[in-house]
Amino acid sequence: MTEVTILGAGGNMGRRITRTLRENPQYTLRLVEPGERGRSLIEESGLQVVDQAEGLAGTDVVVFAVPDKIVRGIAAEVIPLLESSTSVLFLDPAAVAADRVPRRDDISCFVTHPTHPPLYSLLGEEDPAARRDYWGGGLATQAIVFAVAWGDEGQAALVENLAIAMFEPVSQSYRITVDQMALLEPALTETLTNGCIAVIREGMDRVVAAGVPEEATRQFLMGHLQIGIALIFEQFDWRLSEGAQLALARSREQIFRDDWHRIFEPEAVLDSLKQITGGD
């Protein structure tokens, strides 16, 4: 049986992974949560909170389920206290990729993150509730990415299996590097994708403000979002109309800077990671 300590167990992600792991006989959980509300939520679920010293003593894996802005300080406090051969698992690449985590060669460090249920995969879910599990709260199937920051490859298999168990149901675990994960998040998803989506929402609000009925605007936009994504990501054998292709070409000139792809350059990614984890 593997002893797993979850730091930040009372937060959203901490409670999500605890719900799955508590049912798995391969793992014994030690739940660490300093916040009063978080502790109450854990206790209301029928589980017990332990203090940090008890949670860390002799544990096999420490999971950092804490916000990006404070993970740097918590890692600096916790990692020096760990026994040799302990593994640590971060649920986001930011702190590790930005070199915010103290390195100890006698422990192993890993990073994982869920893909969240892919857009068109939700259509294949039989349970109506699973079809609306956009975040990946335990109903809809999703994949994960997993990286070895440093350490023992033998430990990697154990911790990767833990990561899969955390985010079940999981279709696949993709082994990538920490730097590659940072290209996925924040660069590709949080910076580019969410930035584009936020502008789309702003565009919808402007159309409504111009007098188009809100429900008609929303329905029209949601339908065209779905077909646009399906066409551009080649979900079926069809093409954008000539008019749509012309509008798409013009959008490059009117909306996007010529150097927008600079967000993927190493220095831009590092700058974003540093901001996410509390600045310089």
Where are each of the predicted segments found?
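NAD(P)-dependent Rossmann-like dehydrogenase/reductase catalytic/cofactor-binding core
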Residues: 140-141, 212-280
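Rossmann-fold dinucleotide-binding core
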Residues: 91-184
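Short acidic-hydrophobic, aromatic-tinged amphipathic segments that line or gate anion-handling sites
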Residues: 48-54, 175
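Rossmann-fold NAD(P) dinucleotide-binding segment
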Residues: 53-102
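Short glycine/serine/threonine-rich phosphate/pyrophosphate-binding segments
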Residues: 12-17, 71-74, 119-121
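An accessory alpha-helical subdomain
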Residues: 177-228, 245-249
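NAD(P)+-binding Rossmann beta1-loop-alpha1 motif at the extreme N-terminus of oxidoreductases
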Residues: 1-48
